[in-house]
Amino acid sequence: ISCSLVGSEMCIRDSIGTGKIAKKLICILRGFGMNILAYDLYPDYNFAREHQVVYTSLDELYHNSDIISLHCPLTEQTKYLINDYSISKMKDGVMIINTGRGQLIHTNALIEGLKNKKIGSAGLDVYEEESEYFYEDQSDKIIDDDTLARLLSFNNVIVTSHQAFFTREALANIASTTLQNIKDCLL
């Protein structure tokens, strides 16, 4: 059985700033009437006011969110942001989505949370040890990573290969920015 987004408490977690991706998602989710909670080291209060986002502490965010979506870089502060301790503070049945970096989530803690039903579901566009399994076709190989194999065995977990940069537009933007940076250095 699925859940309704209407009226859900949604947490957008971005540790360095409510960045472009999180802001786009917030705009989409507000269309469903979702209440948005956010934690950010550098809150964008103008954006929050305009889009009815409530900045809060991590503890309040964990305690009140039905859905936790991670959109932040991997830093010393964010490594294993989702772990046994943070999961214990979350609502029962919470949905966790990670499109940021794999090591934002301690995978074994996620698995335990899924097994004991503390975590109701997970959507992972990144994985802690993804380098061997993503970015090239591995469909003819056996997965020898027992942790990844266990994650894939859950019917309430979706794992996709992180391909955020791999579009024509993104590659053109990367090339354009690189060329501009070179020009700026030479001038």
Where are the regions that the model predicts?
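Single conserved hydrophobic/aromatic residue that forms the stacking wall/gate
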Residues: I1-G7, C11-I12
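Phosphate-binding beta-alpha-beta segment of Rossmann-like dinucleotide-binding domains, i.e.
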Residues: S8-E9, K24-C27
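Glycine-rich Rossmann-fold phosphate-binding loop(s) that bind the pyrophosphate
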Residues: T18-G19
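NAD(P)-binding Rossmann-fold cofactor-contacting core
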Residues: G31-R49, Y127-E129
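Short acidic low-complexity segments
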Residues: H51-S65
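Short glycine-/small-residue-rich Rossmann-like dinucleotide-binding loops
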Residues: D66, C72-L74, G100-R101, Y127-E128
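Rossmann-fold NAD(P) dinucleotide-binding segment
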Residues: Q77-I96
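Rossmann-like dinucleotide-binding domain for NAD(H)/NADP(H)
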Residues: G93, Q103-L187
